[in-house]
Amino acid sequence: MKKKYRIKKNDDFQKVFRRGKSFANRQFVVYTLKQEGSTHFRIGLSVSKKIGNAVCRNRIKRYIRQSFHELESQINPENEYIIIARKPAANMDFHEVKKSLIHVLKVGRVLKQKPNNSK
């Protein structure tokens, strides 16, 4: 995922926190805010030091970014997303992270339904 599609600035994070909607499961909290006219979604990641050391935190962030990259065609391009990882995410492999993100995005109704004949 290109860096221009990431949320980095504190003001951008605060805007999504204040105006956006949130939904969660045991592993992740997702905040979403609709941005009219945007051609591509942006994501911001937050993984607390409580979750583990730098290696563990960076692994979780890589897994989340890769999951969004693979789900790119199903995700609404007019939204900004902030994903906050919770403690149970520390012990998950990539496939579990992706499955959990799919679940929480479906709960928030921001994931388009995948056609039955494609993988």
From Swiss-Prot:
E.C. code: 3.1.26.5
Domain of life: Bacteria
Reaction equations catalysed: Endonucleolytic cleavage of RNA, removing 5'-extranucleotides from tRNA precursor
GO annotation, cellular component aspect: ribonuclease P complex
Entry function: RNaseP catalyzes the removal of the 5'-leader sequence from pre-tRNA to produce the mature 5'-terminus. It can also cleave other RNA substrates such as 4.5S RNA. The protein component plays an auxiliary but essential role in vivo by binding to the 5'-leader sequence and broadening the substrate specificity of the ribozyme.
Assigned protein family: Belongs to the RnpA family.
Protein name: Ribonuclease P protein component
